[in-house]
């Protein structure tokens, strides 16, 4: 919570002004019972109309002052809370952007979304309520007790005894409610996870008729959220009857003792009225506590969740550029890597080298470590053992930012952003000109297809490029990587949806490009054009060589070849 509230520091002056205005409003409210007592004792009971007019005018003036202070307090409280919300979301987003793949995986995507939206909103609401009401309520209680004792010690004593009992009860509710609302936020994460998965996989769900199954899954998670939320709210709502019961008993005792004191002549009517007035105002302040407790406990749970992200060790941001363009030489020396919280190594003792402008094809079954190998090159992960060299320099000695600026990476899962085709291609390079965008599209063999669309490069894509075919999305992703003019190009099964003719044109265009290309593929037709082929199995590099070398020396490669071309194909080679 403390970490989250650090974003309030720039607005401490404005928050201070809001508090002063709130105290002004509170002071006026605490003075009103005393003025009413004056009007009753010195005006009404003595039939002195002048006192009624004088103190009545003072009350009206103070009420106007209180109204103005309240309006300004609301303005500053809203400004501070909204500014806090903006800065916190910005800080959280920047923090998440600094995470490596392994650090990012500590929380689920839906959990990040909940923390950036719902959790920040909960703390924002608490800040607004603190500057507007949350601090005012306890101050009203304390001020009401003190002034009640100042008016009449005997009658004020009833409040002095009752209020601490209620405060102890409220502290118990606060502690119990905090645990419940933390559980509510976790259940909300689970609901958000299911919603996110369903929105992403809606086509698959409809195609396989799994809608009813997913509805049941959602209802189950949503029911658990509802049950936990109801439990939390029931606890909070339980406080109101208890508060009202004890405070009403206290007011009855004050009335009973006050009437006895008035009869005996030891107390004036105005004093009893003033203390009853303070008691009702304190009751009003206490009646807000269930609502304030709910806000605070939810904000406390949310603030702790925000703090978890902010306190997570981010990866050291290695800013900087590389003075010269990389030649693209890559060397792996006995590299091993295991994902966090996984027992089995994803890569084990892998060694190979790629010369500048070479094309390396990587083959292997699912889970053999192909994509993992790619992710080590731009330092998305760090190897557990072994060394990786780029241009004969240890990769960890090259600034991460400068290294990644010279790498074009097309991941296995195509991801297009909302916006136009032009914006999606230009996303790979800031301030890219239209000519650069079109050149990259031509290399990726997508230029002619784009021109056939109604709005050409200004065609707006649906969510995740839903209005494009798989092959079109892959080629736009490749164009986005090529616009960077990379020294190293990593294609993670990025041509799987292309027909053989289009893929051949694409690879031929890339071969004229001055970059080292590593391509993960399942197609022998793609691999056989490469300068070198790496064959991975269960995280180990078991074979490497050219197409003809592997076809004659590797039984596994030969089986893959025959599965695609038949036994006659391998014999003819």
UniProtKB/Swiss-Prot annotation:
<keyword id="KW-0472">Membrane</keyword>
<feature type="transmembrane region" description="Helical">
    <location>
        <begin position="238"/>
        <end position="258"/>
    </location>
</feature>
<feature type="transmembrane region" description="Helical">
    <location>
        <begin position="275"/>
        <end position="295"/>
    </location>
</feature>
<feature type="transmembrane region" description="Helical">
    <location>
        <begin position="52"/>
        <end position="72"/>
    </location>
</feature>
<feature type="transmembrane region" description="Helical">
    <location>
        <begin position="153"/>
        <end position="173"/>
    </location>
</feature>
<keyword id="KW-0067">ATP-binding</keyword>
<dbReference type="InterPro" id="IPR039421">
    <property type="entry name" value="Type_1_exporter"/>
</dbReference>
<dbReference type="Pfam" id="PF00664">
    <property type="entry name" value="ABC_membrane"/>
</dbReference>
<dbReference type="GO" id="GO:0016887">
    <property type="term" value="F:ATP hydrolysis activity"/>
</dbReference>
<comment type="similarity">
    <text>Belongs to the ABC transporter superfamily.</text>
</comment>
<dbReference type="InterPro" id="IPR003593">
    <property type="entry name" value="AAA+_ATPase"/>
</dbReference>
<feature type="domain" description="ABC transmembrane type-1">
    <location>
        <begin position="15"/>
        <end position="298"/>
    </location>
</feature>
<dbReference type="GO" id="GO:0140359">
    <property type="term" value="F:ABC-type transporter activity"/>
</dbReference>
<dbReference type="GO" id="GO:0005524">
    <property type="term" value="F:ATP binding"/>
</dbReference>
<feature type="transmembrane region" description="Helical">
    <location>
        <begin position="127"/>
        <end position="147"/>
    </location>
</feature>
<dbReference type="InterPro" id="IPR027417">
    <property type="entry name" value="P-loop_NTPase"/>
</dbReference>
<dbReference type="GO" id="GO:0042626">
    <property type="term" value="F:ATPase-coupled transmembrane transporter activity"/>
</dbReference>
<feature type="domain" description="ABC transporter">
    <location>
        <begin position="330"/>
        <end position="563"/>
    </location>
</feature>
<dbReference type="InterPro" id="IPR011527">
    <property type="entry name" value="ABC1_TM_dom"/>
</dbReference>
<keyword id="KW-0813">Transport</keyword>
<keyword id="KW-1003">Cell membrane</keyword>
<dbReference type="GO" id="GO:0005886">
    <property type="term" value="C:plasma membrane"/>
</dbReference>
<dbReference type="GO" id="GO:0055085">
    <property type="term" value="P:transmembrane transport"/>
</dbReference>
<dbReference type="InterPro" id="IPR017871">
    <property type="entry name" value="ABC_transporter-like_CS"/>
</dbReference>
<dbReference type="Pfam" id="PF00005">
    <property type="entry name" value="ABC_tran"/>
</dbReference>
<feature type="transmembrane region" description="Helical">
    <location>
        <begin position="17"/>
        <end position="37"/>
    </location>
</feature>
<feature type="binding site">
    <location>
        <begin position="364"/>
        <end position="371"/>
    </location>
    <ligand>
        <name>ATP</name>
    </ligand>
</feature>
<dbReference type="InterPro" id="IPR036640">
    <property type="entry name" value="ABC1_TM_sf"/>
</dbReference>
<dbReference type="InterPro" id="IPR003439">
    <property type="entry name" value="ABC_transporter-like_ATP-bd"/>
</dbReference>
<keyword id="KW-1133">Transmembrane helix</keyword>
<keyword id="KW-0812">Transmembrane</keyword>
<keyword id="KW-0547">Nucleotide-binding</keyword>
<protein>
    <recommendedName>
        <fullName>Uncharacterized ABC transporter ATP-binding protein YfiB</fullName>
    </recommendedName>
</protein>
């Amino acid at each position: 919570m403390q970490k989250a509230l650090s974003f309030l520091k720039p607005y401490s002056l404005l928050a201070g002004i809001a508090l002063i205005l709130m105290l002004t409003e509170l002071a006026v409210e605490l003075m009103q019972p005393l003025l009413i007592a004056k009007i009753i004792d010195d005006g009404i009971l003595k039939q002195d109309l002048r006192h009624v007019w004088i103190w009545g005018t003072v009350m009206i003036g103070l009420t106007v002052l209180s109204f103005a202070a309240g309006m300004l307090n609301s303005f500053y409280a809203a400004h501070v809370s909204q500014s806090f919300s903006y800065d916190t979301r910005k800080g959280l987003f920047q923090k998440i952007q600094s995470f490596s793949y392994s650090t990012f995986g500590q929380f689920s995507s839906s959990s990040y979304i909940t923390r950036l939206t719902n959790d920040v909103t909960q703390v924002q609401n608490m800040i607004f309520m603190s500057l507007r009401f949350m601090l005012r309520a306890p101050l009203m209680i304390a001020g009401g007790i003190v002034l009640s004792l100042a008016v009449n010690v005997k009658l004020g004593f009833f409040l002095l005894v009752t209020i601490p009992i209620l405060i102890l009860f409220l502290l118990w509710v606060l502690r119990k409610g905090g645990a419940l609302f933390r559980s509510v936020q976790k259940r909300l994460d689970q609901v958000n996870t299911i919603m996110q998965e369903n929105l992403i996989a809606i086509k698959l769900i409809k195609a396989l008729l799994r809608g009813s199954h997913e509805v049941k899954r959602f209802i189950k998670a949503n029911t658990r959220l509802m049950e936990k939320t109801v439990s939390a709210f029931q606890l909070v709502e339980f406080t109101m009857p208890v508060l009202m019961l004890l405070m009403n008993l206290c007011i009855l005792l004050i009335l009973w003792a006050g009437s006895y004191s008035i009869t005996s002549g030891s107390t004036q009517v105005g004093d009893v009225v003033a203390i009853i007035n303070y008691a009702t105002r304190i009751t009003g302040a206490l009646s807000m506590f269930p609502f304030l407790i709910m806000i605070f406990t939810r904000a406390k749970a949310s603030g702790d969740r925000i703090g978890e992200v902010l306190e997570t060790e981010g990866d050291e941001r290695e800013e900087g550029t590389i003075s010269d363009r990389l030649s693209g030489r890559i060397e792996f020396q006995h590299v091993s890597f295991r994902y966090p919280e996984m027992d089995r190594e994803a890569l084990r003792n892998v060694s190979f080298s790629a010369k500048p402008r070479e094309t390396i094809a990587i083959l292997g079954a699912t889970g053999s470590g192909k994509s993992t190998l790619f992710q080590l090159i731009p330092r998305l992960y760090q190897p557990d053992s072994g060394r990786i060299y780029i241009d004969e320099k240890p990769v960890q000695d090259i600034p991460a930012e400068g290294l990644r600026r010279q790498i074009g990476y097309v991941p296995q899962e195509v991801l297009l952003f909302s916006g136009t085709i032009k914006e999606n291609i230009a996303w790979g390079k800031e301030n890219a000109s239209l000519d650069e965008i079109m050149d990259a599209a031509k290399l990726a063999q997508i230029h002619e297809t784009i021109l056939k669309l109604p709005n050409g490069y200004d065609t707006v894509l649906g969510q995740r490029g839903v209005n494009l075919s798989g092959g079109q999305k892959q080629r736009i992703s490749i164009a986005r990587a090529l616009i960077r003019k990379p020294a190293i190009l990593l294609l993670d099964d990025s041509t799987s949806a292309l027909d053989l003719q289009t893929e051949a044109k694409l690879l031929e265009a890339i071969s004229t490009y001055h970059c080292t290309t590593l391509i993960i593929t399942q197609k022998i037709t793609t691999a056989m054009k490469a300068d070198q082929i790496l064959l991975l199995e269960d995280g180990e590099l078991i074979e490497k060589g050219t197409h003809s070398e592997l076809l004659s020396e590797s039984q596994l490669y030969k089986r893959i070849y025959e599965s695609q071309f038949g036994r006659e194909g391998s014999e003819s080679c």
